[in-house]
Amino acid sequence: MSNVPNELKYSKEHEWLRKEADGTYTVGITEHAQELLGDMVFVDLPDVGTTVNAGDDCAVAESVKAASDIYAPVSGEIVAVNDALSDSPELVNSEPYGQGWIFKIKASDEAEVAALLDASAYEALLEDE
């Protein structure tokens, strides 16, 4: 089974969310998602300053197998993107919960964060797939 860190929140679309000390949230795709996609060749990042709604497609992960939309797990403003992915998209594969993060968002509604899946609920979702 894929690694599912307890401290993160998860979406049903296989994005993860981690609260940072400054109150923003870092977003990436889960180990499960990157395993399904295979080796990353390109990540199309959102523009900093863009306002998104929960569920909006805001980035694209392109792998040797497919291109897959990455969805905003919560509504808010994109405040940073992982520029390292431009030169090293494989970080999404090698460090999905670390250096392979996709973007940071300032959430506009904390209730959306609370409504995301915890690690045990996400693990149950994976077992049902």
Swiss-Prot record:
The modification N6-lipoyllysine is found at residue 65. GO terms for biological process: glycine decarboxylation via glycine cleavage system. One of its GO terms (cellular component) is cytosol. Keywords: Lipoyl. Binds 1 lipoyl cofactor covalently. Residues 24-106 form the Lipoyl-binding domain. Its cofactor is (R)-lipoate. It holds the Pfam family GCV_H. It comes from the Bacteria. Belongs to the GcvH family. The glycine cleavage system is composed of four proteins: P, T, L and H. The glycine cleavage system catalyzes the degradation of glycine. The H protein shuttles the methylamine group of glycine from the P protein to the T protein. This is Glycine cleavage system H protein. The gene is gcvH.
